Amino acid sequence: MESNGVPMITLSSGIRMPALGMGTAETMVKGTEREKLAFLKAIEVGYRHFDTAAAYQSEECLGEAIAEALQLGLIKSRDELFITSKLWCADAHADLVLPALQNSLRNLKLDYLDLYLIHHPVSLKPGKFVNEIPKDHILPMDYKSVWAAMEECQTLGFTRAIGVCNFSCKKLQELMAAAKIPPVVNQVEMSPTLHQKNLREYCKANNIMITAHSVLGAICAPWGSNAVMDSKVLHQIAVARGKSVAQVSMRWVYQQGASLVVKSFNEGRMKENLKIFDWELTAENMEKISEIPQSRTSSADFLLSPTGPFKTEEEFWDEKD
């Protein structure tokens, strides 16, 4: 347990990761002083794990916040932090992986990442990040060569560990068939309204840590949902336990053996989100949550194409498997 009360999880590679991280996706203040100050405040109140990505366009502000936190003495060294970033799909080609990671390091003003993840199980034609992806740019990913390049990034010391995001059991099997270094993390949507039971069991059997995103329904994202925050079941449990709905949702994820990333720029909620580790949901609480109707919030529509590797959401998520 760290001094901020956040437990440390030992990944299969042996490195330790804070169980709770601050997400940096879909902020409304990208690249602004406010965004940097929010990251700085998060460090001040106790966050030590930050989850970013090339596609989030938040790496530079996070890097500035880390540098300022060091200058202010909020942290004594970069080693106190756990920094995750992600490989964007347009760079998911064997010869572009290392340059993409090095670009993320330049943005972050860091010498190494703690964790580097493949953002999606699909590639795009090489080029700059764009919000509207042309359908003819969507390509199948060569898991073997892209993962080998990820392994090289770890071997060279530019990242301490490697993993994936949004991979189904089937896609993990394909990737691991050619892997020399197995992925240590699979970051996916997981919440009381999307339990991911089969995927959790598969990842546990293969020593892959699930990191949950959209734990509160990604309500600030264009595809977000109020299903978690408006859940009557979660509200009833929260009132009975003297907690917030957000805390109940986050605690449920943690009690499933998963780590999680959440995002808030509100100092009060930042502090509240850290307070989920000194209490437990009861067996009765867990039983009620198990009965909540299930639905996916995140959409892969922007990566679907009649000529691409995945034509439907079902194919992308392998939900019929």
Curated annotation (Swiss-Prot):
Optimum pH is 6.8 for reduction (forward reaction) of codeinone to codeine and 9.0 for the oxidation (reverse reaction) of codeine to codeinone. The record marks K86 as: Lowers pKa of active site Tyr. Pathway: Alkaloid biosynthesis; morphine biosynthesis. Optimum temperature is 28 degrees Celsius for reduction (forward reaction) and 30 degrees Celsius for reduction (reverse reaction). One of its GO terms (cellular component) is cytosol. Changing H120P: Strongly reduced codeinone reductase activity. The active site is at Y56, H119. Latex secreting cells (laticifer cells). Expressed constitutively in all organs with highest levels in capsules. Restricted to the parietal region of sieve elements adjacent or proximal to laticifers in roots, stems, leaves and carpels. GO terms for molecular function: codeinone reductase (NADPH) activity; oxidoreductase activity. In yeast (Saccharomyces cerevisiae) engineered to produce opiate alkaloids, the expression of COR proteins leads to the accumulation of neopine and neomorphine as major products. Disruption phenotype: Plants silenced for all codeinone reductase proteins accumulate the precursor alkaloid (S)-reticuline at the expense of morphine, codeine, oripavine and thebaine. InterPro entries: AKR, AKR4A/B, Aldo/ket_reductase_CS, NADP_OxRdtase_dom, NADP_OxRdtase_dom_sf. It is found in: Cytoplasm, Cytosol. Residues 300-321 are annotated as: Disordered. Changing W88H: Reduced codeinone reductase activity. It comes from the Eukaryota. PROSITE patterns: ALDOKETO_REDUCTASE_1 (PS00798), ALDOKETO_REDUCTASE_2 (PS00062), ALDOKETO_REDUCTASE_3 (PS00063). Keywords: Alkaloid metabolism, Cytoplasm, NADP, Oxidoreductase. Substrate binds at H119. Changing H119F: Lost oxidase activity and strongly reduced reductase activity. One of its GO terms (biological process) is morphine metabolic process. Its EC number is 1.1.1.247. Belongs to the aldo/keto reductase family. NADPH-dependent codeinone reductase involved in biosynthesis of morphinan-type benzylisoquinoline and opiate alkaloids natural products. Reduces codeinone to codeine in the penultimate step in morphine biosynthesis. Can use morphinone, hydrocodone and hydromorphone as substrate during reductive reaction with NADPH as cofactor, and morphine and dihydrocodeine as substrate during oxidative reaction with NADP as cofactor. Converts morphinone to morphine, and neomorphinone to neomorphine. This is NADPH-dependent codeinone reductase 1-3.
